[in-house]
């Protein structure tokens, strides 16, 4: 049979031989291409499985060897604990301007009433006049000169705002008692010794807020 096939091939016209050769080469190319494609798909699948295994190993200590899992678990627990603690720490941070909002309802009402009178009533005019005279007669400092050289309406507003800040510093918490009132003054005393203008304003705020403090 092989001899007959060879004889038929010899007798075949040359153009048919070329066609058959081209067809054979095309089939070989297609077969080689399929093999490469299958190999590439297999390689991708292996890489994907390897990647999944690596990710799973990095997030689940149970898939790691026992000694490695023991090292990772404390780190995971520590991270979870720090995430739970973080909001509590943030909750404790408060700006001075919002401290008055933590006061008891009665003290909060009295504090806001007092601050409103400072900004809108004769109490505020009396306050800024007293502060101006005290600052004018005190030992000269850069801060006192700055305030005395301000335009009157701007100076009055600045003194009222500084007084409000100190009032909110003194009256805060669920219920401010006399011992709390005294303690808060002592906390800022070192600062006041260096800032004489602030000391004068703090003393006036102390005097204004004394009636709010509960025994």
Curated annotation (Swiss-Prot):
The keyword Transmembrane helix does not apply. The keyword Transmembrane helix does not apply. Pfam families: Paramyxo_C. Residues 12-34 are annotated as: Disordered. It comes from the Viruses. GO terms for biological process: symbiont-mediated suppression of host innate immune response; symbiont-mediated suppression of host JAK-STAT cascade via inhibition of STAT1 activity; symbiont-mediated suppression of host JAK-STAT cascade via inhibition of STAT2 activity; symbiont-mediated suppression of host type I interferon-mediated signaling pathway. The different isoforms interact (via C-terminus) with unphosphorylated and phosphorylated human STAT1 (via N-terminus), favoring the formation of parallel STAT1 homodimers. The different isoforms do not interact with host STAT2. C protein interacts with L protein; this interaction has an inhibitory effect on viral transcription and replication. The C protein is found in virion at a ratio of approximately 40 molecules per virion, presumably associated with the nucleocapsid. The P/V/C gene has two overlapping open reading frames. One encodes the P/V/W proteins and the other the C/Y proteins. Belongs to the respirovirus protein C family. This is Protein C'. It comes from Sendai virus (strain Nagoya) (SeV). The gene is P/V/C.
């Amino acid at each position: 049979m092989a001899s007959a096939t060879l004889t038929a091939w010899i007798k075949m016209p040359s153009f048919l031989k070329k066609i058959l050769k081209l067809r054979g080469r095309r089939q070989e190319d297609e077969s080689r291409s399929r093999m490469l494609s299958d190999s590439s798909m297999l390689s991708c699948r292996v890489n994907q499985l390897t990647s999944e295994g690596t990710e799973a190993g990095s997030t689940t200590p149970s898939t790691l060897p026992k000694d490695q899992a023991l090292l990772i678990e404390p780190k995971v627990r520590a991270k979870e604990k720090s995430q739970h603690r973080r909001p509590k720490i943030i909750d404790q941070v408060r700006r001075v301007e919002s401290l008055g909002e933590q006061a008891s309802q009665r003290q909060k009402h009295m504090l806001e009433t007092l601050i409103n009178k400072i900004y809108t009533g004769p109490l505020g005019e009396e306050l800024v006049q007293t502060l101006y005279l005290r600052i004018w007669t005190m030992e000269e400092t850069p801060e006192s000169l700055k305030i005395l050289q301000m335009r009157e309406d701007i100076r009055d507003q600045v003194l009222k705002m500084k007084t409000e800040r100190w009032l909110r510093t003194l009256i805060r918490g669920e219920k401010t008692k006399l011992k709390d009132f005294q303690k808060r003054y002592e906390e800022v005393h070192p600062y006041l010794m260096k800032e004489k203008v602030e000391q004068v304003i703090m003393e006036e705020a102390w005097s204004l807020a004394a009636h709010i403090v509960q025994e």
